[in-house]
């Protein structure tokens, strides 16, 4: 548990699949981006449900109803407090695995995960540590948590709080447990989609390509989609339509 009681209750939005397709019951845990609003990713979740796959949209730690009154943003999950960032990201992964517990208790036999931005990192960590998650759609990718914070446009204020106290090499080592890179081998045997934007300044292109290279070098099966947009423009039409189609098509095919 964290020191904030509000944050210790997990909130989820459950969208059951539309009827019509026979076979094994399928569900996807949806992890939104950092500082996502309560209604974000609900439209995508509805499309997933209409495609015959139930969707469970999870509120990340310190987001939505889980945010204590002293916060206006979910700063505790990504901040210059290195230890707290580790702890809260770990909590997010544990929350996700408990969501999988809930889905299996409801009789779902095939479970996937979809994560965007920070949610993508957390989704890969959850999938790497949970054999029940068979399919992972990772939307915006990087091998290292620290490098995104260090180089990304959206985390410049976090780096400002770190400057002068720690260098990138040390930060990368400390945040390695919450980085995808050490867990690439654990994704072997799963269906994995890696999506990134060609003009992304928040998850810089070099980092996205580096994670793809890790999968290729280790010969861990995966698919790659490169979108003709940046980070936040992924959420704006027509790029949001292209991104949504890419993600849902992959889930529908492999789950």
PLM feature segments, named:
Residues 209-255:
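C-terminal catalytic histidine-bearing segment of alpha/beta-hydrolase fold enzymes
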Residues 124-170:
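Hydrolase active-site cap/lid region
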Residues 115-127:
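Glycine-rich nucleophile elbow surrounding the catalytic serine of serine-hydrolase chemistry
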Residues 104-117:
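Alpha/beta-hydrolase fold nucleophile elbow
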Residues 151-207, 213:
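The feature captures the conserved acid-bearing segment of alpha/beta-hydrolase catalytic domains
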Residues 30-91:
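Cap/lid segment of the alpha/beta-hydrolase catalytic domain
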Residues 1-21:
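N-terminal cap/lid segment of alpha/beta-hydrolase-fold proteins
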Residues 88, 92, 117-120:
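Active-site loop->helix "elbow" adjoining a glycine-rich segment at hydrolase catalytic centers
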